[in-house]
Amino acid sequence: MVLTARQRDELNQAIHQYLLISYQQSAQVFKTEAVVKDGQIEADLLEKKWNSIVRLSKRVITLEQQVEQLNEQLAQAQAGKIQFNKSDDEQRLTPFEKFKLEGHRAGVNCVAFHPQYQILGSASDDGSIKLWDYESGHFEKTLKGHTSNVNCLAFDPTGKYICSASSDLSIKLWELKNHTCVKTLIGHEHSVSTVQFSDHGDFILSASRDKSIKLWEVQTGFCKKTFSEHQEWVRCAVFSNDEKQMASCSQDQMIYIWVIDSGQILHQLSGHEHVVEQVKYVPEHGAKQILTQQQQQNIQTINLLVSVSRDKEIKIWNTILGTNLFTLSGHDNWVNGVSFHPDGVHMLSVSDDKTIRVWNLKEQKQKKKIENAHDKFILKCEINKFIFATCSVDQTIKLWLLS
C-alpha cells in the first residue's frame, strides 16, 4: 500500500513525537532526514495507532474463524446434511457469553456503546465511570468526578463526548480525548436518573427524582425547558424517533407522551401496576413490521414505545393513538431494561429474576430464556450490532455475542 503525501507526513510526525520521549538525538536526526514539519498532532498517536492495529488484527482473526464456520455450515446445508427449521431462528438469537468485565466496587447501573469505536462505558454506584475495549475485554480508563452514585451515561452521536447522570444532583459532560470533565450541568434538586443525547448532539434530555424532566443545550450548558407533571420520581425520559416528542415514565406508574416544543402532554398511558422503570422507542423499521402484523398500516403510527415495569410486564404502546397494543408476560420479578436486535423485531429484556429473555414483537412471543445470566439482579442492557452488554448488582458487566 502506498501512502499519500498527507499520510506520510502524519506518520513521520507521529514517529518524531514518539522518539522525542526517550531518544532526543535520534529524533533530531530523523526530523532532518524525513523533513518533518512542525505541526499539531495528537499526543501518543503512534501508540494509539499501534494498539488499534493489534485490536483490528484480533478482530480479523475472529471474523475469519466465523466465516470459516459459516462456510462449513453452508456446505453441509447444500449437501443436505443440515435441515433448517423454526428452531434455527431461536438458536440464531441465543446470546453467548464472551467476556465478564470486573473492576467496579459496587453495582453497575448502566452500560453504553461508543457510536464509532470499540469502547463500552459503564456507570456504577461506586461513583465512577469506566471505559472498556469490548473487543478484547480490556479495561481502558476510569473517569472520576461525581461524589455519589452514577446512574446513567450516554455517548453523543459523534463519540466526542460522554454524558453522565448522578445522585449528586449533577450531570457531567466529559471529553473522551482527554478524559476530562468539560461541563457540569446543575439544576435538578434530587438524583438524576437518566440522560440521553439528541440525534444531532445539540441537546441532552434528563430525568430526575425531583419529579421533573429537563432539556439542556449542550453548547451553553443551560437548561432550555423543564417538564413537571409527574407525581413521583421520573425514572426515564427518551426522545421519540423524530425528536418532536418524548416519553417519560415514573414511580407514579404513569407514562407521559410530551410534545417537546409546546411542553404539552399528548397522552397519559396507564396500565402498569407498579413502578415503570424504563421506556424505549421501537426502531422505525421494526415498528412498521409490527404495525403491519397488527393491521395498523398508517405510516403516521410509527412511534411505538416499549415500557418495562416492576409489575413483571413489558407493554408496547401506539403513542399516536395512546393505546396499548399488547403486553408481554414471562419474567418472574421486576423488569429493568430492554434493547432491540438490529432487525428491529426481536427484543431482549433483563430482570431482577437474573434472566435474559428474547422476544419476537411481531409474534408477541418469548423465543429464548437465559437462566442465571448474572449472580444478582440485572439492571440494564444495550446492543451494538451483534454485541449485547448487561450490567448487574453483582458489580460486573457481561458481553454477549448475538448472530
Swiss-Prot record:
UniProt-listed Gene3D superfamilies: 1.20.960.30, YVTN repeat-like/Quinoprotein amine dehydrogenase
Places the protein is found: Cytoplasm, Cytoskeleton; Cytoplasm, Cytoskeleton, Microtubule organizing center, Centrosome
PANTHER family listed in its UniProt record: COATOMER (PTHR19876), COATOMER SUBUNIT ALPHA (PTHR19876:SF1)
Keyword set includes Lyase: no
Record GO biological process: cell division; establishment of mitotic spindle orientation; microtubule sliding
WD repeat start-end pairs: 103-142, 145-184, 187-226, 229-270, 271-327, 330-369, 373-403
HAMAP family: lis1
Keyword annotations from UniProtKB, A to Z: Cell cycle, Cell division, Coiled coil, Cytoplasm, Cytoskeleton, Microtubule, Mitosis, Repeat, Transport, WD repeat
GO CC list: centrosome; cytoplasm; microtubule; microtubule associated complex
Domain of life: Eukaryota
Residue ranges of domain LisH in the record: 7-38
Protein name per Swiss-Prot or TrEMBL: Lissencephaly-1 homolog 2
Domain note: Dimerization mediated by the LisH domain may be required to activate dynein.
Species, as recorded: Paramecium tetraurelia
Family recorded in the similarity comment: Belongs to the WD repeat LIS1/nudF family.
A family per Pfam: WD40
UniProt function note: Positively regulates the activity of the minus-end directed microtubule motor protein dynein. May enhance dynein-mediated microtubule sliding by targeting dynein to the microtubule plus end. Required for several dynein- and microtubule-dependent processes.
Primary localisation category: cytoplasm
SMART domains membership: WD40
Cytoplasm keyword on record: yes
Listed InterPro entries: Coatomer_complex_subunit (IPR050844), Dynein_regulator_LIS1 (IPR017252), G-protein_beta_WD-40_rep (IPR020472), LIS1_N (IPR037190), LisH (IPR006594), WD40/YVTN_repeat-like_dom_sf (IPR015943), WD40_repeat_CS (IPR019775), WD40_repeat_dom_sf (IPR036322)
GO MF annotation list: dynein complex binding
Ranges in coiled-coil conformation: 51-87
